[in-house]
Structures are given as C-alpha cells and as structure tokens.
C-alpha cells in the first residue's frame, strides 16, 4: 500500500506533464496569428502608392516603381499613438514637420505643418 502512495502521485504528475507537452505550440492545436508590428515601425503606403518606412527613428519615402527617394528625416514618439516627423523633401528642397496618429494597427492619419492631411496604410510583410 505504501508503494502505491508513492507511485500514484508520480504517475499523475507524468500524465500532467505529458498533457502540457502535447498541447503546446506545434501540436497543431494552437491557431497561427499574424503579428502586426507595434507602433509605426515598418513599411506604409499612401493611396498614390508612395511607400514610407519608419525604422529606428529614421523616416524615408520612396516611389514604388523606381525606388527613388522623395523625402527623408527622423521621427520621435510623442505618445504611444502619436509621432512627430521632421522631414526634408528631396524633390521640393523644403523641410516640414508632420504629426501622425496611429488610429489602428494598420492606419496612420497624418497632418503636415502646412495643414494638409493624408493617411498611410501598413504594408503587409512579405
């Protein structure tokens, strides 16, 4: 009887550990969820097909057909959802400030210091 008291809890513990092992990731039971980057890091596109990238504080805008750089600058977070971009237009030779609000994980609404408004949509990775 004493032996049963030792073996039974060990057997139950083994079953519990085995259950954890077989229901973890990779067992086929967990759904795969696409990960959207946090904040504005990554690639975005405007309705005209102009691509903008935000990477480690560096901002760039390029054409999608020839990859010509149109603007460059830097950005900083004013809050988790609000970003200030200081940019220089290579095409126009001007500098401006743009404030952008992350209204959803895939949409960025922006207003330039001149008052023009535009939206950017996050590009799919891959």
Swiss-Prot record:
Q: What is its main location?
A: membrane
* Subcellular location(s) of the protein: Cell outer membrane
Q: Does the keyword Transmembrane helix apply?
A: no
Lipidated positions (N-palmitoyl cysteine) are 20
| Alphabetically ordered keywords of this record | Cell outer membrane, Lipoprotein, Membrane, Palmitate, Signal
Is Ribonucleoprotein included in the keywords of this UniProt record? no
Q: Where is the lipid attached (S-diacylglycerol cysteine)?
A: 20
Note, other: Elicits an immune response in B.melitensis-infected sheep but not in B.abortus-infected cattle.
- Sequence similarity: Belongs to the rhizobiaceae omp10 lipoprotein family.
Query: Can you say what this protein is called?
Result: Outer membrane lipoprotein omp10
The gene is omp10
